[in-house]
Amino acid sequence: MAKCKEEVFNWEDEEQEEIIWVSKSEIKRDAEALKKLGEKLVNLTKTNLDKIPLDTGLRDAVELAQRLQKEALRRQIQYIGKLLRAIDPEPIQEALNKIENKHQQQQAKLHKLELLRDELVQKGNSAFTELLIQYPHADRQHLHNLIRSAQKEREQNKPPKSYREIFQYLKDLILED
């Protein structure tokens, strides 16, 4: 009869490493998040893509995905997600957040300019003097003429040409500071 060899394992001698169990669902959620990060990378312009720290293999995969369509694009995004799982995606996510935040800040500035333009056309002189106090180097005569033209265009239901010119002037005036 064969004897069973029993191994005696002393747990106290071994260093106790804490085992972290990760559920299959959590792994899938993480993979899906990385795939979405890959989609964001594919949708970036070349100049924005240059600002993100990517290794050459990942960069080539993203540039290839930008040229693909439909099913090939889907498979390439899956592949990009796989490449992202092999590296630390944190620096990539941070760089992407900076780019998106910069875009949101730019949109907010343009929205403020639109509100200022509306205020100038509706309120007239009171808003105009406030603007001149904030920006004394503004061309007073030109801006005043644009505001009057925009008010006339609004009254006569004409296309808002001066209205757009006010926005362009404010954009040049304020965003150059």
Swiss-Prot record:
It comes from the Bacteria. GO terms for molecular function: ribosome binding; rRNA binding. It is found in: Cytoplasm. GO terms for biological process: assembly of large subunit precursor of preribosome. Its main location: cytoplasm. CDD domains: YjgA-like. InterPro entries: DarP, DarP_sf. One of its GO terms (cellular component) is cytosol. The keyword Phosphoprotein does not apply. Keywords: Cytoplasm, Ribosome biogenesis, RNA-binding, rRNA-binding. Belongs to the DarP family. Member of a network of 50S ribosomal subunit biogenesis factors which assembles along the 30S-50S interface, preventing incorrect 23S rRNA structures from forming. Promotes peptidyl transferase center (PTC) maturation. This is Dual-action ribosomal maturation protein DarP. It comes from Histophilus somni (strain 2336) (Haemophilus somnus). The lineage of its organism: Bacteria, Pseudomonadati, Pseudomonadota, Gammaproteobacteria, Pasteurellales.
